[in-house]
Amino acid sequence: MSIQIPRGTQDILPGSVELWQYIEGQAREICRRYNYKEIRTPIFEHTELFLRGVGDTTDIVQKEMYTFQDRGDRSLTLRPEGTAPVVRSYVENKMFGDATQPTKLYYIGQMFRYERPQAGRYRQFVQFGIEAIGSNDPAIDAEVIALAVEFYRGMGLKNIKVVLNSLGDPASRQAHREALIAHFKPRIGEFCSDCQSRLEKNPLRILDCKRDRDHELMNTAPSITDYLNEESTAYYEKVQELLTMMGVPFEKDPNLVRGLDYYQHTVFEIMSEAEGFGAITTLSGGGRYNGLVQEIGGPEMPGIGFAMSIERLIMALKAENIELPIENTIDCYVVALGDKAKDHAAKVAFDLRKSGLSVEKDYLNRKMKAQFKSADRLNAKYVAVLGEDELDKGVINLKDMATGEQEEVALDVFASYIAEKLI
């Protein structure tokens, strides 16, 4: 019996991986333009990091984490999200002491959640995320959202929208929390068991429930906007003003809360309205987490960030029938005819690769027709044919696969000649 891939995972094969590489390259490029630097953290962390950083009342912590005991009886968890590990690294490596603040970081990496596999949701998935730590300026909130929108637009997506809300500062959140408890408590028995347990611990999460979202009490729940104090209201309005100035359209949704406990003030999601999805689908989300650095053991430092699923992005591209400009070709295929030519072909391929070209050759001693078929399948720009006759003349036959034109080139200058054509 053959061993198969674990449920909720996928192999990304040659022919598909080029799309991923292109997307990751564009993510790195936009981060370069906004001056975000890459950070790489371990794929597993101490479980305590996520209990404190993500929140022990969240679905991620309660239901979705891959947690195990190592041989030293330490509890470790495969990272389910990227923000807490980045903040842990920020604190541990004392990045808060840098002269230039905020510290602007990005990551592209695999995350792990034990979820029910479905379209666009895997148990191992790839996130692209950014974190800006060390500034309480609404301008950085607007910048983070604008970066995400610009990235999606750069991918060609048109049917996207930004949904925005504010959860306020701790005082505003506490006032809203008390109002939510008073609103839901008399009829909490009508809600699912998750919502019942959330009532006292984190009633805001009830608004995020998928099972009870159509309950009449959801539609009449107290809105956070009614409990924002003057400072929180001013902050929220400034973020909106800056987004408008940047040409980033948005919709306000007072029920948007996000699924993690560390958010304060600005929260947002970017959604796809593409008809190919069949329903509005969240592509990415993020927000401000002013208490997280301190919770993980650092000084009081504000932060904001977002994370997006690469798998969801690829689904959105397909839903909008967008084909990215991915070049899946090689520069030259070397055809060898005969044993003597085969040895020289290896040297030709080596010299071409040294010149910076992508090159392939035959390793199965096939006939010329079969080798040309391989060159076609690999989308070779040129085919170099080397046989006994060419060796005797000290030349190589070069064919342009786009035009069909052929020419003979001296062997001793062939590498530099074709490199000049292609580089």
Swiss-Prot record:
GO BP field = histidyl-tRNA aminoacylation
Q: Known CDD domains for this protein?
A: HisRS-like_core (cd00773), HisRS_anticodon (cd00859)
Keyword ATP-binding listed: yes
**For this UniProt entry, what is the primary localization, expressed as one broad class?**
cytoplasm
Entry's InterPro entries?
A: aa-tRNA-synth_II, aa-tRNA-synth_II/BPL/LPL, Anticodon-bd, Anticodon-bd_dom_sf, His-tRNA-ligase, HisRS-like_core, HisRS/HisZ, HisRS_anticodon
Gene Ontology CC annotation, any one: cytoplasm
Kindly list the GO molecular function terms attached to this UniProt entry.
ATP binding; catalytic activity, acting on a protein; histidine-tRNA ligase activity; transferase activity
Protein EC: 6.1.1.21
Signal peptide boundaries = none
According to the record, the segments passing through the membrane are none
The subcellular localization recorded is: Cytoplasm
Keyword list (alphabetical) reads: Aminoacyl-tRNA synthetase, ATP-binding, Cytoplasm, Ligase, Nucleotide-binding, Protein biosynthesis
Question: Which transformation does this protein catalyse, written as a reaction?
Answer: tRNA(His) + L-histidine + ATP = L-histidyl-tRNA(His) + AMP + diphosphate + H(+)
Any Pfam family from its record, for instance, is HGTP_anticodon
Mind telling me which SUPFAM superfamilies this protein's record contains? Answer: Class II aaRS ABD-related, Class II aaRS and biotin synthetases
Per the record, the similarity remark reads: Belongs to the class-II aminoacyl-tRNA synthetase family.
Which PANTHER family does the UniProt record give?
HISTIDINE--TRNA LIGASE, MITOCHONDRIAL-RELATED, HISTIDYL-TRNA SYNTHETASE
Assembly: Homodimer.
Q: What is this protein called?
A: Histidine--tRNA ligase
Gene from which this protein is expressed:
hisS
